[in-house]
Amino acid sequence: MSGFQQHTGLVVPLDTANIDTDAIIPKQFLQKVNRIGFGKHLFHDWRFLDDAGQQPNPEFVMNAPRYKGASILLARENFGCGSSREHAPWALADYGIQVMIAPSFADIFYGNSINNQMVPVRLTEQEVDELFQFVEANEGAEITVDLEAMKVRANGKEYSFEIDEFRRHCLLNGLDNIGLTLQHADKISEFEAKIPSFLK
C-alpha cells in the first residue's frame, strides 16, 4: 500500500448524526470477501430509489453534481456506529473516499478505516460546524488534510487533530497488519529455521 501524507480534495457534506454501517453498506451486499466492488453500493438505500440501484435519488447529497468526485466525507457525530462489518470502510474506499471528518467515530469503524488506509479525522463539533458552513456555501470547496502535521486546512484556517502515533505511523507508511508483519520477515525466517524438524 502507498502511504498517506497529505491530501487535498473535494468535500461532500453528509449532515446526519449516528450513521450506522447498515446505512453505509446494507446487509444484502455483504456476500463478497474481497475489498473491490462495494463502492457502487455505498449508501445504497439513500442513493437510489429502487432496489436495483438504477434510479438515483435526486434528493441525496452525494448524487448532487457539485459533489461528484468527492474524496473527503464530512459527517456528524458517531459516524460508523452499528455492526462491526469491515465492508463499510471497503465501500467508502472503493467509492473514492480517502478522508472522513466528524466529531466522533464508532471505535471499531475507526480502527477498520485506518486498516484500510483511510484517515478518520476527529474535530470538535464547532469546527465541524464551520466546515459544513464553508462547504455548503462554496461549490467546489476543497479541504487539505495533512497527516504529517496533523492539520486540516480550509478557508484560510487551520484545525489541529490527534491520532495515536502507532496508527499515524501505519498510515504514513502504508502499513496494514500484513505489512507490519512483513517488516519482520527476516526475524520470522530466522526463528523458523531454529525450529527442530520434528516440530515442523
UniProtKB/Swiss-Prot annotation:
Q: Which protein family is it in? A: Belongs to the LeuD family. LeuD type 1 subfamily.
What's the source species for this entry?
Answer: Vibrio atlanticus (strain LGP32)
Q: Name one GO cellular component term.
A: 3-isopropylmalate dehydratase complex
What name does this protein carry? 3-isopropylmalate dehydratase small subunit
* Subunit field text: Heterodimer of LeuC and LeuD.
* InterPro entries in the record: 3-IsopropMal_deHydase_ssu, Aconitase/3IPM_dehydase_swvl, AconitaseA/IPMdHydase_ssu_swvl, IPMI_Swivel, LeuD
- Function summary: Catalyzes the isomerization between 2-isopropylmalate and 3-isopropylmalate, via the formation of 2-isopropylmaleate.
The pathway is: Amino-acid biosynthesis; L-leucine biosynthesis; L-leucine from 3-methyl-2-oxobutanoate: step 2/4
